[in-house]
Amino acid sequence: MKFVTFRDPKGRPTPGVVVDGNSAVLDLLTASGGQITTVLQVVEGGPAMLDKVRDLAANPGAEHIVALDGLRLEAPLRPVQLRSFSVYALHLERSFRAVAKHHWNKLKSLLFKVAIKIPPKQFFERPVYYKGTVTNIAGPHDDIIRPPYGEKLDYELELAVIIGKKGKAIAPADAEEHVFGYLVYNDVSAREQLFDEVGPMSAGPAKGKDFDNSNIIGPWLVTRDEVPDPMNLKARVRVNGEVRGESSTSMMSHSIAEIIAYTSTGETLYPGEMIATGAMPYCCGIEDWKFLNDGDEVRLEIDGIGQMTNRVVPG
């Protein structure tokens, strides 16, 4: 199933599930008699709630069906937590080499020496991540808003995982049963700011990642049963219709199962948490030193998940 949040005729955020061969949406709010009010409620409701949605979708009343075409889709849900991982070694290699080549002259030599050693061996020993901000979540029809410090504004195409089952100390072999589904994620980044935030005196990414609409997810939340092999999904980025890069989740240095297992070490994971798997190689502008201009339309696609297009606007 594919879960969406859309605006009803009164402008209210409304949960729905895609039906009729991806041509229509079942309004879950009205079809459930007001019992289902958000997609997060479905995620937190577990198997019983999914069964209820399946029953509603199997016998929908015509009055609860709306055409998908023309609907304004919001972010499918607002996650209760956001962890953003980096598990693509090639992305790091290409990014650091680009910074070494193009960034501040006084750092070129030093950065290049670092770049040829990136990633360090610790990168392969365990997955690394930072905490994101869920208040900056935006959806597939929202704008990318350039922050005041966004001279080098960039996109990052990522596969995101939504947790559907509570768990702690989850073994990799059991990780899949804790997944509710998957999303396309654009981890919008202000690179100039990030250059100042990833140095030795920094606690990690901050304002370079945290600004309005910087975490764009969509177009829908696809349940895990519709994604038989999330570790082998092809993906691409287009800017103004031009293909900027193509990649695959098969290039991860740590699997989704390993990421979930590591995250749950000494800590309980809860339904509704979002785990982003990191920027795919060739699918962010910094690697080729091509950044976004106002008016650009950025389209992110992951086969089997979906695609979304967002326009860059000045802040």
Model-derived features: where do they sit?
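Short strand-turn-strand beta-turns centered on an Asx-Gly dipeptide
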Residues: 239-241, 303
